[in-house]
Curated annotation (Swiss-Prot):
UniProt GO cellular component terms: cytoplasm
Keyword hit for Ion transport: no
Function of the protein: Catalyzes the condensation of two molecules of acetyl-CoA to produce acetoacetyl-CoA. Involved in solvent production.
Species whose genome carries this gene: Clostridium acetobutylicum (strain ATCC 824 / DSM 792 / JCM 1419 / IAM 19013 / LMG 5710 / NBRC 13948 / NRRL B-527 / VKM B-1787 / 2291 / W)
Subcellular location: Cytoplasm
Activity regulation behaviour: Regulated by a redox-switch modulation. Reversibly inactivated by oxidative stress through the disulfide bond formation between two catalytic residues, Cys-88 and Cys-378, which enables the enzyme to protect its active site from oxygen radicals and be reactivated upon switching back to a reducing condition.
Protein name: Acetyl-CoA acetyltransferase
First-tier enzyme category under EC: transferase
Subunit structure: Homotetramer.
Amino acid sequence: MKEVVIASAVRTAIGSYGKSLKDVPAVDLGATAIKEAVKKAGIKPEDVNEVILGNVLQAGLGQNPARQASFKAGLPVEIPAMTINKVCGSGLRTVSLAAQIIKAGDADVIIAGGMENMSRAPYLANNARWGYRMGNAKFVDEMITDGLWDAFNDYHMGITAENIAERWNISREEQDEFALASQKKAEEAIKSGQFKDEIVPVVIKGRKGETVVDTDEHPRFGSTIEGLAKLKPAFKKDGTVTAGNASGLNDCAAVLVIMSAEKAKELGVKPLAKIVSYGSAGVDPAIMGYGPFYATKAAIEKAGWTVDELDLIESNEAFAAQSLAVAKDLKFDMNKVNVNGGAIALGHPIGASGARILVTLVHAMQKRDAKKGLATLCIGGGQGTAILLEKC
């Protein structure tokens, strides 16, 4: 079976909710990332066999957002494209799917990744088609309904984090300490330029000229444990999950060029990392945040590795509670986890997050000369996904 490698890995900066990227459609963010990924891989647009992009909040975005992004990026019309929705795992699943397609011999070069603009999610008028007879009407927030709401238990994702905090006995203090560490690491990473090689600037044209967005907006520099402790529970009256120890609502695109090793050699491309294995798992939706535990175990078993062998770990921080539960039970060395901060600080643009953490992992492995890496996320509805990489 073919060996699969990552030829390039790029992302846009992560925009805060309603801030700099709020008027940039997800497909435009995706197109920007695709262009840069192709350029950095050193390949021609016509070398690409397929485009697979994750996107969750698709209402009002138009047919097949991945195809739109491909067109806007200037790829040839003959290249097919597919949009994947595996909620928070979408962007990572596109990469494992690309690897599977390449291993099967059906393609040699695939653009994979994810894109999301949560700021642009519309409100839905579900009964408008056949007319409101009289009285008040209700608008439904598509961002909440399609992205952040447990369809099985009829409650917010935040409650699933509360469930984990209770079941695993994870205190408010532990969650806040974890969140603070994420903020501090992200602040240091941004100030020291750790993300410069992975971020492609987004240029926004306006009446007053151009605005360039090239720095993550979500981190709160100067965060303190005292400040986090003052925040009230966000989802449950006596709960422990707050806006400070949960991830944000964000806008971003992240894209990777995935290739067979033989094609990379043929084209003279120097790969960044090899995709070793991937895992996927389902769990009780009420504790969806625990999904990475099983997905990681599956990927580790396939690779024949142990957790101790991992040099770097990108474990998406949907909530501090679920991140801690997974880390404790998998016995992660916390010095290896999210070394440049995670989603609590950087943000969680749901359809893009899987690709975003993988892009960040690839670059961190290069900078730190780390041999083995893991990227994993929990998924709303009760799932987990994971990918293992080896530096080339």
